[in-house]
Design a protein with these regions (language model features):
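Conserved C-terminal helix/tail region of periplasmic/extracytoplasmic solute-binding proteins
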Residues: 49, 213, 431-486
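Extracytoplasmic "Venus flytrap"/periplasmic binding protein-like
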Residues: 101, 105-178, 213-216, 315, ...
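Extracytoplasmic/periplasmic solute-binding protein
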Residues: 185-198, 203, 228-280, 321
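Extracytoplasmic/periplasmic substrate-recognition and gating elements
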Residues: 213-215, 289, 297-304, 338-404, ...
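Ser/Thr-rich, Proline-interspersed low-complexity disordered segments
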Residues: 16-20, 26-75
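Glycine-centered hinge/linker elements that transmit conformational signals in sensory
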Residues: 230-232, 265, 276-307, 352
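Hinge/lid segment of periplasmic solute-binding proteins
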Residues: 63, 67-73, 144-202, 344-351, ...
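Long, aromatic- and glycine/proline-rich binding clefts that accommodate carbohydrate-like moieties
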Residues: 177, 347-350, 398-451
Length: 486
């Protein structure tokens, strides 16, 4: 049997390999499309959207002249616009229906064509392919960090400030005020608003209340120590019952997703992870080492386990996990799984344990307009504005789940939301909700963070290796960003 390489060399090799993969998957986009001199891309944006307006404006009559940053409306007739998104299943089917409805009802003669990318990374690859491709989109629904990247590194995304604030073709002040400030800020860079929130989601902890009560726990955990105690109790029961098949299960299913790791870090008190000029990630902090060590102790003691499949919802329904970490959009799937597997257990969702306040971290998809011709940009914006109307946002919320992106959308979806106790619970966490890092570099940093966390949980890595892992974590993020010109 071969001896493994020294730990420092091994960690460095893994992080370098991670950097290579990320450079391949996240290469900067190609040359930006050629934009006519009269396009909206030539207009300097000046509207600040970080402060919501206090009240709505009255309905106005149609203008007699087209604003300078728009095109004559007659030029919109016959414009064919491609809308690409990462949704699938029922949500993608609903998007198809909405696009068809827009095509039939819009007064400008705009024709939208929808393209299902399949995933956010596939969509990024499509944009990276350049505007000469036949399926290159003019409007997208994409993660905020991707929109920010296309704005800052490639000049592919169009700032929307002027369009949003236009008194006739923009969003009303009330519509802007209805969208939570934290959602607006996720799509901002240097005063430019590059996106309109479409769907927001967050990692949550699924928790089996019935099983926990049988284990002797009357209340859900509110601290990390409580969380570990309950997970260990569930693991002990499964390892000492008469069924050998469930040995090694029962606690928390390990989830190394970057946003889940970031949520754990925030629950342990991570601060100032973005600092400097330009902003850089700083995860090499004592709190990160403490967080990694806590989860590692759960793994070492058998209270957290790596699942063989991605079906955490089924493990949960079968009492092979007291906890697992999923997304708010997974609520319908878990309900259907419990019904299918005939589980009678009561379950709920929890924020990440902090002890003082609920810790939740929100991210998601936003509508964005990619640079093209002036007529295409205007047509794309009018579709985004239509999709962002409260009634359409409410429909997307009802179909795709997640958090309401505006107060008006929440009110319109109130009946369905109130029928789901877990959904109602999530709304109560809105006041303390935190944002995923609202910077373009998060699309890189989240995967490097994920890899470093995974390394810290391996049996051949010792606690003494953690400082090196964290040092390499920050260095690798900087290295990959530099390779991509960021």
């Amino acid at each position: 049997m071969q001896n493994r390489p020294p730990t420092q060399q091994w960690i460095t090799v893994l992080l370098v390999l991670t950097a290579v993969v990320l450079v391949t998957a996240c290469q900067p986009t190609g040359e930006p499309p050629v934009v006519p001199t009269d396009s909206t891309s030539q207009v300097e944006t000046s509207v600040e959207l970080t402060q919501p307006a206090p009240e709505s404006t009255p309905t106005r009559l149609a203008p007699t002249a087209t604003p300078a940053y728009l095109v004559p409306l007659a030029e919109l007739n016959g414009q064919e616009i491609i809308f690409s998104h990462p949704w699938s299943g029922e949500t993608a089917d609903w998007i198809d229906q909405m696009v068809d409805s827009f095509n039939q009802s819009n007064e400008w003669g705009i024709h939208m064509m929808v393209r299902r990318a399949g995933s956010s990374m596939a969509l990024a690859d499509r944009v990276k392919g350049g505007n000469l491709a036949a399926d290159y989109p003019q409007v997208v629904a994409a993660p905020s960090e991707h929109l920010l990247s296309w704005l800052e590194y490639g000049n592919l995304a169009l700032p929307l400030n002027e369009l949003i604030a236009d008194p006739y073709f923009g969003l009303t002040e009330q519509q802007r005020a209805d969208i939570p400030l934290v959602f607006w800020q996720q799509d901002q860079s240097g005063g430019n608003q590059v996106g309109i929130p479409a769907q927001r989601d967050m990692p949550v902890i699924f928790y089996n209340e019935t099983w926990a009560a049988e284990l002797g726990f009357a209340e859900p955990p509110t601290t990390a120590d409580d969380f570990k105690a309950q997970a260990c109790a569930a693991a002990f029961v499964n390892s000492h019952d008469r069924f050998a098949a469930n040995d090694g299960t029962g606690g928390w299913i390990v989830n190394t997703d970057g946003l889940v790791v970031y949520s754990w870090l925030k629950s342990f008190g991570l601060k100032d992870e973005l600092a400097g000029s330009p902003l850089q990630f700083h995860y090499d902090q004592p709190v990160t080492q403490t967080t990694f060590a806590f989860v590692r102790s759960m793994v070492d003691e058998g209270c957290a386990w790596f699942s063989r499949t991605t079906a955490s919802n089924e493990y949960f329904a079968n009492r092979q996990a007291l906890f697992y970490t999923g997304n708010l959009t997974d609520l319908p799937l878990q309900a259907k799984t419990n019904t299918r597997l005939e589980s009678q257990d009561s379950w709920t969702i929890l924020p990440f344990p902090d002890g003082n306040r609920p810790v939740t971290v929100v991210s998601g998809l936003s509508y964005g307009v990619l640079r093209s011709s002036a007529a295409q940009e205007t047509a794309a914006w009018l579709f985004v504005r239509w999709m962002s109307q409260p009634e359409n946002s409410a429909k997307l919320l009802a179909v795709g789940g997640g958090l309401p992106v505006s107060t008006a959308a929440a009110e319109l979806a109130r009946t369905q939301m109130d029928s789901n106790p877990q959904w109602v619970l999530a709304q109560q966490w809105m006041p303390t909700m935190q944002s995923a890092p609202p910077v373009a570099g998060w699309r890189i940093a989240r995967f490097v963070l994920q890899d470093a966390f995974w390394q810290s949980l391996q049996s051949f890595v010792t606690l003494e290796d953690f400082p090196l892992i964290l040092e390499q974590l920050d260095a690798t993020i900087v290295e990959v960003q530099a390779q991509q010109g960021q």
